[in-house]
Curated annotation (Swiss-Prot):
Keywords: Ribonucleoprotein, Ribosomal protein, RNA-binding, rRNA-binding. Part of the 50S ribosomal subunit; part of the 5S rRNA/L5/L18/L25 subcomplex. Contacts the 5S rRNA. Binds to the 5S rRNA independently of L5 and L18. It comes from Actinobacillus succinogenes (strain ATCC 55618 / DSM 22257 / CCUG 43843 / 130Z). This is Large ribosomal subunit protein bL25. GO terms for molecular function: 5S rRNA binding; structural constituent of ribosome. This is one of the proteins that binds to the 5S RNA in the ribosome where it forms part of the central protuberance. It holds the Pfam family Ribosomal_L25p.
Amino acid sequence: MAFKFNAEVRTAQGKGASRRLRHNGQIPAIVYGGSEAPVSIVLNHDELNNAQVHDSFYSDVITLVIDGKEVAVKVQAMQRHPFKPKLVHIDFKRA
């Protein structure tokens, strides 16, 4: 199954900015690895939450469209809320 998500570059950093994103139904994330610099991004929570129930989400290459540019990544780490069915943060590694 091929996964493709739209993402935006995140400019606001820190705990307060991340909490505001989560309150608005978005997830803060980061893309790192390769020769490029790490990029902080924001993704839609519902799209990722629906996709992460598939086993292939964790092993297949995922395409992120970051401001019009496609980047191939794999899930490196995912943080979940302790008791709510919500995602808190995702780390992606360039494939």
